[in-house]
């Protein structure tokens, strides 16, 4: 568990699971895909669909972190790319009826930040040294 990929995957994964569970517990009942959700910590907005997405992504990161370093790096990069796409989509969805995950600017910042860390870890850390002859 002492490799950066495994540690970062576990920490971010557990954080996403906690956020997802809190979103489900504090859901206002506005609707699963409602464009307006409940505020979490006074800043993060989201609905039950975003809560479940965070739980699934977080669980995948945590399970990969408990596996091998190579698998953790691959999953970190893949989920980092998904979070980057979610952040980019969120830029266009905020304030529209198409915002089925009820993301706001703070959610987008969270997704971009997690994506940057996961992509950097998954693509740049824990790589084997090149063979020398």
Protein language model regions, located:
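Membrane-interface extramembranous regions
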Residues: 1-133
């Amino acid at each position: 568990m002492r490799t950066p990929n495994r540690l970062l995957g576990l920490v971010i994964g557990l954080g996403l699971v906690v956020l997802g569970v809190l979103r489900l517990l504090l859901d206002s009942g506005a609707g699963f895909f409602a464009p307006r959700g409940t505020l979490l910590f006074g800043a993060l907005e989201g609905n039950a669909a975003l809560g479940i997405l965070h739980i699934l992504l977080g669980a995948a990161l945590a399970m990969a972190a408990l596996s091998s370093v190579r698998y953790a790096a691959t999953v970190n990069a893949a989920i980092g790319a998904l979070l980057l796409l979610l952040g980019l989509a969120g830029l266009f969805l905020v304030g529209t009826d198409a915002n089925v995950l009820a993301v706001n600017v703070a959610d987008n910042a969270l997704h971009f930040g997690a994506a940057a860390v996961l992509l950097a870890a998954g693509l740049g850390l824990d790589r084997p040294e090149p063979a020398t002859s």
